[in-house]
Amino acid sequence: FHLALTFGLEDDPVAGLERMAGFVESLGAAAGIVEPLQMTVGVTDGEHLWAARYASGPVVNTLYHSADVESLRQLYPENERFAHFGADSRVVVSEPLTPLPGVWHEIPAGAAIVVTKGTVDQVPFSPR
């Protein structure tokens, strides 16, 4: 987290995380480490949430975001948990605890998302 702050996390969160990942990759390469980085990360400023999924090698930890709240309520009207979510809520998790079809959308490896007031935008994530 502190390293990402050093690389501009507050000004441009995705770019700051990409620069941080690039720095770790370059240090790893210099030390002869073949796959130095595996990460799923989420940060927020209280209004936006940025999350990224990345690994140096082929094995990448998982990361998911939820469908919109209205869809969740329609899919699972008996699930009381969804009644407590605000209309613009989204949930981001490393691994879903429950297998609810239609709820979880996997974020691809090498991607980041920006969640703003219930919308989810996906962008490429590539170390710089």
Where are these regions (language model features)?
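Conserved short alpha-helical segments that host acidic/polar catalytic motifs at enzyme active sites
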Residues: F1-R128
